[in-house]
Amino acid sequence: MKKLMLLEIGVLLVILIALIIGAIGFAKPAMAPAELDVPADTAGSTNADSQARQEQTQQTTTQPPEPTWMTFPEDRALKAQQYFVYDCDTDEFLTISGTQDERIYPASITKLFTAFVAMQYIEPETQITAGDVLDLVAWGSSVAELEKGDVMTAEKLVEAMLLPSGNDAAYLLAEQAGRAMTNQEVDAQTAVALFMEEMNEQAERLGMTGTHFVNPDGIHEDTHYTTFADLVQLGKLAIENESVMKYASVPKETVQLQAGSVLWENTNALIDPQNKYYCPYAVGLKTGQTPMAGSCLLSAFQKDGKTWLIGVFGCPEIEDRFEDTLQLFTQSLAGE
């Protein structure tokens, strides 16, 4: 009887063990679907890993900060004697001192129109040799350090006008274009005179009726003048001119001349990322300075598909033209 009871207990234990093993085997597949929902690259990840991934996603989707530039107190007085802000999209002056037909002296801003006219008669890759025309350059004026015998392409001479504001480059282009107009080897002075006639005729045809040019570089003459209305027209022409805009925003470049390497630095500080006056929305154009014109600047700005032209003239110091321009640009954005 005792053996029978032990046998029954043994059978019950075997059945119980079998049931337990079966239950375990049956429960395992229920875990598989949950495991399949976990991506392979996150298997075994922790809450810390998940938080790190969320932070990384937020960082990659965050927009970069808005570019900044030098700003000034609202009550800062402009130093320029004459100035304007022009909206090229609405074709209107947003700010202007005096009237749009008031006569002003453009100084080296003249070189924008010199480039515009000259490159109509000269191919960009035309090789030009500096010669006697350099004798016509005013002593002590800004130059690109060109000497007689230097050879440079016409396009490179445009750069020489726009970066270091080379009056020597302006005369070389004027001479070359003047000769191309007549297809004759006239002397340097005659060639430049012919070019100046063409500059004035083109200004007239373009509606720049308040403008008269005497020389290709902007050295002061009482009869060398323009107006705000005509400068707007000039600025628009410059923005659309490939030869001008190719170099208008180049901060500096080292070039090789006969005398050795020369560094050309752009006189427009607004386009130089290393300069404290740098503005990421400034795209060019040209500075100027004479005793009568003061320190001046015609600038183009582009932001969010819009274009502005800003001119400041008669500034007492070189720095004033950049500070006034930035102040006017900031105020224009705030007024939108």
Go through each PLM region and give its residues.
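Extreme N-terminal leader/anchor segments
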Residues: 43-48
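Hydrophobic alpha-helical membrane-insertion segments, chiefly the h-region
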Residues: 15-27
